[in-house]
Amino acid sequence: MSIISTRLNSIKPSPTLAVVKKTLELKKAGVNIIALGAGEPDFDTPDNIKEVAITSIKDGFTKYTNVDGIPLLKQAIKNKFKRENNIDYELDEIIVSTGGKQVIYNLFMASLDKGDEVIIPVPYWVSYPDMVALSTGTPVFVNCGIENNFKLSVEALEHSITDKTKWLIINSPSNPTGAGYNCKELENIAKTLRKYPNVNIMSDDIYEHITFDDFKFYTLAQIAPDLKERIFTVNGVSKAYSMTGWRIGYGAGSKALIKAMTIIQSQSTSNPCSISQMAAIEALNGTQDYIKSNALNFQKKRDLALSILEEVTYFECYKPEGAFYLFVKCDKIFGTKTKSGRIIANSNNFSEYLLEEAKVAVVPGIAFGLDGYFRISYATSMQELEEACIRIKHACNAL
């Protein structure tokens, strides 16, 4: 009898973390690799946030807290939702967890039974399907390629709904594409969902504050307040405040759902880190001045990367509304032969080729459910980003 559970048969390690691991190994071996795989901002956590954390340590705020987050942080989250999204939540409709990933894991563990279906637009963030599977749910994939601007149409949504559908996932702006749903698109989705009262919606808003040009962010509960009881909104401090390592995410939904998720959390991690919670309060309540400047910085990087990669004849690029990724269509390169005689047949082959030939680490599109693409993160310095994109261009021209 194997010591490993059969549960592991339905899931796999995070492909993006695997790329990061391989990149670090090559760098350690002295290879000049430029890493465009990691999904985290390249700027440091702001000093005002770090100072509050230091003070909380010195003040001895280092013990257990409420499982679902301290009231002061939940109040800051409540205020944030009202101030920025015009949504009213009570404290018992909010949970704080060890990162947004745990919020989503708790959500599915608390709500899914065997056979319950979760509609996941493709491409998707790598962890969605596996967390659904771990929770005994069934992922239902809906292809939303570049021809659909990487967004779910109401026709595709309606076609995917069955009597087993329990959740629809909306991630806007999206990882891996940066595509964002505008107000009208969300209104159309809400109009469709009103016909299906048993379908709940998880809105993953983690990239809310990283948007470009004239794109205006909306979240579904803001657009459709009549659906609020069926909407669970996920957010956190990781991306907007560059606090990926602090591990604070939060969610808001019905009291019954939050209570169930708190029970799940009480038997896994208990409370989020006490020090990180204090830092998150400062992130939400303190100055927000750097958020806009950081978004403008990412926009410049997006434009730089696009200006170079759009020159590659094999590529088709989508201009993202937010986040810090490009999801580039590259299937025209499939079937070509490298100098060593290897055939590039899929996105894994192409990513391996870029790593070997260009010394640039990217993530193959198949990791996000859609072969024929690759993802780059432009959350790096302008100099390194330009060099990486030029290397990719030259490697493609060499084929």
Swiss-Prot record:
EC number: 2.6.1.1, 2.6.1.79
Binding site for L-aspartate: G39, W125, N175, R375
Cofactor(s) annotated in UniProt: pyridoxal 5'-phosphate
Site keyed Important for prephenate aminotransferase activity: positions: K12
Catalyzed chemical reaction(s): L-aspartate + 2-oxoglutarate = oxaloacetate + L-glutamate; L-arogenate + 2-oxoglutarate = prephenate + L-glutamate
N6-(pyridoxal phosphate)lysine modification, residue list: K239
Keyword Transferase appears in the UniProt entry: yes
GO molecular-function terms, A-Z: glutamate-prephenate aminotransferase activity; L-aspartate:2-oxoglutarate aminotransferase activity; pyridoxal phosphate binding
Gene Ontology annotations for the cellular component aspect, listed alphabetically: cytoplasm
Domain of life: Bacteria
InterPro entries: Aminotransferase_I/II_large, AspAT/PAT-like, NHTrfase_class1_PyrdxlP-BS, PyrdxlP-dep_Trfase, PyrdxlP-dep_Trfase_major, PyrdxlP-dep_Trfase_small
One Pfam short name: Aminotran_1_2
Subcellular location: Cytoplasm
Biological function: Catalyzes the reversible conversion of aspartate and 2-oxoglutarate to glutamate and oxaloacetate. Can also transaminate prephenate in the presence of glutamate.
PANTHER family with a match to the protein in the record: ASPARTATE AMINOTRANSFERASE
Self-association state and partner proteins as the record states: Homodimer.
Family: Belongs to the class-I pyridoxal-phosphate-dependent aminotransferase family.
Official protein name in the record: Probable aspartate/prephenate aminotransferase
Organism: Rickettsia prowazekii (strain Madrid E)
Name of the encoding gene: aatA
